[in-house]
Curated annotation (Swiss-Prot):
One of its GO terms (molecular function) is gamma-tubulin binding. Residues 69-81, 238-252 have a biased composition (Low complexity). GO terms for cellular component: centrosome; cytoplasm; gamma-tubulin complex; microtubule; spindle pole. May be involved in microtubule nucleation. Residues 69-88, 231-252, 414-439 are annotated as: Disordered. This is Spindle pole body component 98. Keywords: Cytoplasm, Cytoskeleton, Microtubule.
Length: 813
């Protein structure tokens, strides 16, 4: 018989005994084993109740696995017997402590820890809702090991609690992502839960690997390797049974897959989970930063903040999560920028659409940015550009039904569906560009360039995600320029925006002088009547006459048809001059750009300038009557007063003429020049065009003292009212001279009345002039106080009103 050395299985015996048994051969060990009376041999009755004990072959001789040399205080070995009734392992023995109770085996604690890692209660470790933590069950002391209470030592207990942190985090994260109230709030919420769940699946994989190691050890401890022998109840220990020994005294060598010193322990488990625990802590931080009522950009901003971390591993993990949860956002951005549509069932997109907005407010109020839903990695200026791109496309789709069919338009190619055949055709055409371009006109070449541009943009769009979010800036640069250019062309060429603004300047800002003068000549007398006697249809007829007899007849018919007469709300004591106003009708889609508020501002400016025109018209009428009157010669007794009235009238004409010059050139023309220059050279989108027009009106109002100085405006209105009173006084004097001239029986009584009228005229004239001079000086001082835009120097107006310092010297005297 050949003697061979094999490894003795690891037994829970004294080290000295182990060393001896490792160094002796089976030939010398067998007689000692057979003659050792200290070994308790099971009786025949016990052998029938228990499964056949496994045997081990050493040097060709079968050795009982349960062999233990007798010691003064023998230490029991740790094994587990399989309960044949319920097939569950039960504790058999543990290493006895000095206090007389048994310690729970470590591999059972490890098995519980694996459950805890998944947020599941174990046998000894359970979740405590009150303390919100996993704790060792208080009933653990009731566990019996060899009929004695079991316990967990303090070092192991501390280590178990440190390991339970993993399970507590896992449970918290899993509970959050399974919250349906959070998921139903938005697509971003669902993506967030999905991304976190993907990370949990990876942790499940790690837990499964650990669980495999645990149950491998658990099987080896309980079943000795778990293969199941041929005898007994099938619960073999993995060691070879006696029945496997051959009749010739030889046995087959069986490898025992018993876990040796490299087996899984609590300490090893604690070390191995540090990296997964680090990832789980990041997931826990993500969950803690989110509340149930958050959605869209609020979630993205919170998680994006966590990505700014010095630890590269954490930064990469957050980037991976952000990559997934940003997909709904970037899908909405793509749809918005290329289709002008918003598919946002949960109201989580940072651009909100308001369906109930009036049609004329479509551009300004239909779409707006919701600041709280704007992600932190998209700046406010960038979001405004995104808003303008989508608004432009939506506006064109709503008001320009056939713009997509224009194959010379870039937008036509942006919105073509991806078609492989078309792409192949385009690629084929691209290969022959050099040859074909020689015989093609500029339109076809431009169209091919547009196709190339659209393909470049589409390719960049496919790369758009959180990791490559810089691509969004490039896409915006390309798409914004093209869509804005297209919309500006539509507004300026198809809608003829500048033609309408010019028409407003001509008629509501009194730029068409011949038409305005002719109209005033026709309706001047009617406007002196009380408002109750003013008939609108009659005024409209006079306006049509003025159009036919002035250069307005050469205007486009569309513009002429938009002109109308509007009567302002009446006030007690008003006459026709006070309520008359020209009107300009603006319909859809032009009214989305020239809003009703803009038209109201035009009317406000018209009313102000119309009042100045009325004063000018009244002074001119008085001057004509005086020059044509032959009856004033009989007013020689008040010749000095009449001369004085002429001087006063000249001052008033000088004031009105210079102020009108200031309005027409310093205000209207300069503002118009700035508007034209901006639109031609600087405007890149419709918002800038609208803003430029608003600034144009604002500059006019500021320079006319309509919005920046109530005191100047009131002083000027008072000056106009004084001039109107003066013209009425002059008219009364002319009528008096005519009455005297027509009186055939002029007597002393008449002379007394005439003298009384002369004295009244003189007094009124002096009072009016004194009031006019006082108001004029006050107006001069007020305009010096006004600080308006840098392009307006109030000193220029003051210089025009007193260029020869006449009023300055008069004031000093």
């Amino acid at each position: 018989m050949n003697s061979t050395f094999v490894q003795i299985p690891k037994l829970n015996i004294n080290k000295q005994v182990k060393k001896k048994t490792d160094s002796i051969t089976a030939n010398t060990l067998l007689p000692k084993l057979m003659n050792d009376t200290s070994i308790q041999q099971p009786n025949q009755q016990q052998q029938q109740q228990q499964p056949q004990q496994p045997q081990q072959v050493t040097n060709g001789i079968t050795i009982l696995q349960n062999y233990q040399p007798q010691q003064p205080q023998p230490a029991t070995t740790t094994t587990q017997q399989l309960n044949s009734a319920n097939n569950t392992p039960t504790l058999v023995s543990t290493k006895k402590s000095v206090i007389g109770i048994n310690e729970i085996p470590e591999h059972l604690l490890i098995r519980d820890i694996i459950y805890v890692f998944q947020g599941i209660d174990g046998t000894y470790i359970k979740y405590n809702k009150q303390s919100d933590s996993f704790k060792i069950d208080e009933n653990t002391s009731n566990t019996l090991v060899n009929g004695e209470p079991a316990y967990i030592s303090k070092p192991k207990r501390d280590l178990v609690y440190r390991l339970c942190e993993f399970g507590w985090l896992f449970k918290k994260v899993r509970l959050f992502i399974t919250n349906n109230d959070f998921k139903k709030t938005g697509l971003t919420n669902q993506s967030f839960c999905s991304a976190i769940n993907d990370e949990l699946i990876e942790l499940y994989r790690i837990i499964a690997i650990l669980e495999t190691q645990v149950y491998k050890k658990f099987d080896m401890v309980n079943y000795g390797g778990g293969g199941g022998g041929s005898g007994g109840s099938g619960s073999g220990s993995g060691l070879e049974s006696p029945s496997s020994v051959s009749s010739g005294g030889t046995t087959t060598s069986t490898e025992i897959p018993f876990i040796d010193g490299d087996s899984l322990t609590l300490i090893r488990l604690f070390v191995w989970i540090q990296s997964p625990l680090k990832r789980l802590k990041v997931l826990g931080t993500c969950v803690d930063s989110i509340t149930v009522d958050m959605k869209g950009g609020e979630i993205l901003s919170k998680i994006d903040t966590l990505s700014k971390h010095g630890d590269q591993d954490i930064r990469i993990l957050i980037h991976n999560i952000m990559f997934k949860i940003c997909q709904p956002l970037f899908s909405m951005i793509r749809l918005w920028m290329f289709k002008g549509e918003i598919n946002d069932p949960y109201q989580e997109f940072f651009i909100r659409q308001y369906e109930s907005v009036q049609l004329e407010k479509t551009w300004k109020e239909k779409f707006a940015i919701v600041a709280r839903l704007l992600p932190s990695f998209i700046s406010l200026p960038l979001s405004k550009r995104i808003l303008i791109i989508g608004k432009s496309i939506n506006y064109m789709k709503q008001f320009c039904n056939n713009f997509k069919e224009d194959k010379n338009d870039r937008y036509y190619y942006y919105n073509q569906e991806d078609d492989d055949d078309d792409d192949e055709d385009h690629d084929d055409n691209d290969d022959d560009d050099e040859n074909e371009n020689q015989g093609e006109d500029d339109e076809i070449i431009e169209r091919k360039l547009l196709i190339k541009e659209s393909k470049i943009i589409k390719e960049k769009t496919k790369e758009l995600n959180y990791i490559n979010k810089e691509v969004l800036q490039e896409i915006i640069e390309l798409v914004s320029r093209q869509s804005s250019e297209r919309l500006l062309k539509i507004v300026l060429n198809r809608f003829k925006f500048m033609n309408h603004v010019k028409a407003l300047k001509k008629y509501l800002l009194l730029g068409q002088g011949d038409f305005i003068q002719y109209l005033m000549d026709l309706i001047g007398e009617d406007l002196l009547k009380p408002t109750s006697q003013i008939q609108r249809h009659k005024l409209v007829g006079w306006m049509d006459t003025a159009i036919r007899n002035s250069n307005a007849q050469f205007e486009e018919q569309d513009i002429v048809n938009r002109l109308d007469i509007a009567l302002l709300p009446e006030r007690p004591g008003n006459i026709g001059w006070d309520i008359f106003s020209l009107d300009y009708h603006v319909d859809t889609p032009l009214n989305t750009i020239l809003s009703p508020n803009d038209i109201l501002r035009y009317k406000k400016i018209f009313h102000f300038m119309w009042g100045i025109k009325r004063v000018e018209y009244s002074l001119a009428s008085i001057w004509r009557k005086i020059r044509s009157s032959t009856s004033l010669s009989i007013l020689s007794p008040i010749g000095g007063d009449i001369h004085k009235s002429h001087l006063i009238m000249n001052e008033m004409v000088h004031f009105i003429s210079n102020f009108q010059y200031y309005l027409m050139f310093e205000v209207l023309e300069c503002s118009w020049k700035n508007l034209e220059k901006f639109i031609d050279q600087e405007a890149t989108d419709l918002d800038q065009l609208i803003e430029a027009h608003h600034q144009y009106l604002q500059d006019i109002c500021n320079k006319m003292f309509l919005s920046n100085s109530d005191s100047c405006y009131e002083c000027f209105k008072k000056l106009l009212s004084i001039i109107i009173k003066f013209t009425l006084l002059q008219t009364k004097l002319i009528n008096l001279s005519i009455a005297i001239q027509n009186e055939k029986n002029f007597n002393e009584t008449h002379q007394a009345q005439v003298n009384k009228e002369f004295n009244s005229f003189r007094n009124h004239l002096n009072n009016l002039y004194q009031e006019y001079t006082t108001s004029f000086y006050k107006f001069q001082s007020e305009i010096l106080k006004v600080k308006v835009n840098q392009d307006l120097n109030p000193i220029s107006l003051q210089y025009m009103l007193d260029f020869n310092e006449y009023y300055e010297e008069k004031k000093d005297n």
